[in-house]
């Protein structure tokens, strides 16, 4: 009987400790001003193969996904988008760590890897599916995007054609488009060179460091 009594006391003490720990956990709150572990940015800059490759080089970028955004239909295919009838733009959705890279830095990378003077095209690719645009997630991104565009406008005499619009549904592109530059490095380099992308970027922004 005495052994059973101690067992009951032990069980009761264990339950009390669990309740105390649970209450402490519920009362805890995250520190004010802490940043989220990840955030999302979405950019359209012509061929998503190239945009994805450019952002994959940036420290603090967690992942990139090629896809379609800004159109009128759900779940578009590459063939539908490339024909120009859906209103979607080829784009890249970027998941990044705000503690390692700021949204301002991503905007800077974006501008320096597009032709902001081109309307409804980028480099050798023509059509509104290749338009350049910043798709913002929230008012903070919108404000930063507009400030960055204003700075770019001061650099060029011609009007800036890059749109700034709220992000809508993003549809992941077919799997063979994901990390295309990794899966098909020779074809990717051939396309990028013959499209004149880097030559035009150097003309606009100067040589990269």
Language model features by range: what are they?
Residues 8-10:
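Small-residue packing motifs within transmembrane alpha-helices
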Residues 2-6, 15-209:
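Flexible coil/turn and secondary-structure edge motifs
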């Amino acid at each position: 009987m005495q052994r059973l009594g101690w067992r009951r006391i032990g069980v009761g003490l264990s339950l009390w400790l669990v309740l105390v720990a649970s209450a402490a956990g519920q009362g805890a709150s995250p520190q004010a001003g802490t940043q989220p572990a990840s955030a999302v940015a979405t950019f359209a800059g012509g061929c998503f193969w190239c945009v994805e490759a450019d952002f994959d080089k940036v420290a603090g970028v967690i992942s990139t996904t090629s896809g379609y955004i800004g159109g009128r239909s759900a779940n578009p295919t590459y063939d539908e988008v490339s024909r120009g009838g859906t209103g979607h733009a080829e784009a890249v959705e970027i998941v990044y760590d705000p503690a390692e890279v700021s949204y301002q830095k991503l905007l800077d990378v974006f501008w320096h890897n597009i032709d902001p003077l081109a309307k409804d095209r980028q480099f050798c690719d023509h059509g509104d599916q290749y338009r350049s645009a910043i798709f913002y997630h929230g008012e903070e991104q919108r404000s930063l995007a507009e400030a960055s565009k204003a700075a770019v406008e001061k650099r060029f005499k011609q009007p800036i054609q890059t749109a700034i619009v709220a992000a809508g549904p993003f549809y992941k592109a077919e799997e063979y488009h994901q990390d295309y530059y990794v899966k098909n490095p020779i074809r990717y380099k051939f396309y990028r060179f013959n499209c004149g992308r880097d030559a035009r970027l150097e003309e606009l922004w100067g040589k990269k460091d």
